[in-house]
Amino acid sequence: LGDVYKRQEPVLLQQPLLSRYDKHNREMKHVYGYMRGKKKKTEFERYAMQCFPNFYERAMQVRSQLSENLYYKEHSGQTKDVCHGEYNYHNLLLTKSGLATTNFEHAAPGVQLLDMAYFMRKVMEKNKWQVEKGVVLWNGYCEGAGCSKKELEFLITILSYPIKYWKLLNQYINSKKTWISNKSMEKLKAVCEQEESKDKFLQQMRTFTLGTSQKA
């Protein structure tokens, strides 16, 4: 499975994370303004507006923290590392010879720890941010790649960003706002309701040890 996917075209640089967050934050504010201006609001719009202040404040805090993050400053300008771009369990295959990764369409030079953050967020959302699951993931990362305090702080910062909330608002505004599926409403409620559990998990993450493979 080593040749499951061979990239033929040149790999493009990922959009800088700070620029991406700036764009997301502007989009969230724009969608909120649109919803607020509507006279007749749907259940989705009312609920999204109710959750907005907390999520937007968090998004702005993350942007500020990231601009001062040491790990990001050290790695954001490097292009020698390649990110998968969509590293989750759907793109992993368990074979007789070990674990294989597939689907490299989004691969690009970038901060490699973002793959870990993406994978961890997907798993933790499915498990309602259970601390025990997070400990297993973090220990597995430390055992395989080594870990440092700077990496842990970067990971916490990335996981803090309300990316799922932004995604739902973005889908809403791009769907011409004419019809919101029940599935979207369920996802929005889940994101808002899980925020307390997510906060507790992120607080607990700050106490995680760096394992035996500690890096400087």
Which stretches of residues belong to each language-model region?
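Short, small-residue-biased leader/transition segments that mark boundaries at the very start
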Residues: 1-5
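Catalytic activation segment of kinase domains across protein kinase-like and atypical kinase folds
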Residues: 90-116
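Catalytic-loop of the protein kinase fold
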Residues: 82-84, 89
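Helix N-cap / loop-to-helix initiation motif
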Residues: 147-151
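ATP-dependent phospho-/nucleotidyl transfer catalytic cores
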Residues: 8-82, 184
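Active-site activation/catalytic loop segments of kinase-like enzymes and analogous catalytic loops
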Residues: 113-146, 159-179
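ATP/Mg2+ or Mg2+-diphosphate-binding catalytic cores
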Residues: 29, 165-216
